[in-house]
Amino acid sequence: ADMRLISCPGAEELTGLIDKHLVRWAKAAGIDKETFIIPCDCPRFQSGDAKGLVKESVRGDDIFIVVDPGNYSVTYKLFNYENHMSPDDHFANLKRLIQAVAGKAHRVSVIMPSLYGGRQHRRVVRESLDCAVALQELQTMGVRNIITFDAHDPRVQNAVPLMSFDNAMPTYQ
């Protein structure tokens, strides 16, 4: 299966850097490929709702979706106000793009430099476990692998014991 990249809004720069390395490695292996990036978009309607739109076929491909839930610089207009995207907005866009490729891609992996909800790794009294539930939701949607960096508490992967969870520590570099 061919490997392809999808960038959620706000992760274009990181996706571009990953793509540069992949193109260089492919050329060294004798594969002439201009880019691994699939054009996509998450347009918003006037109501504030959005949709995920993938602009090329992904049939049979291994898809890596890059999302940066901690990027607060991404904005969108809603009722003539400029809104900054929250981690919840980024996670919703990730799920939209997963839905857009579901059932067509061979395998879906998510590259999430900052783990969504990662600071909420254990429950105290009556509070939510957003990270664990988010990982379970991604697994239910068909995501096979999560790649993250320096997870606050890597034991959160216990929420999805059958899904691959790669936590790269910066000390490895």
Model-derived segments and their meaning:
Residues 1-173:
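PRPP-associated nucleotide enzymes
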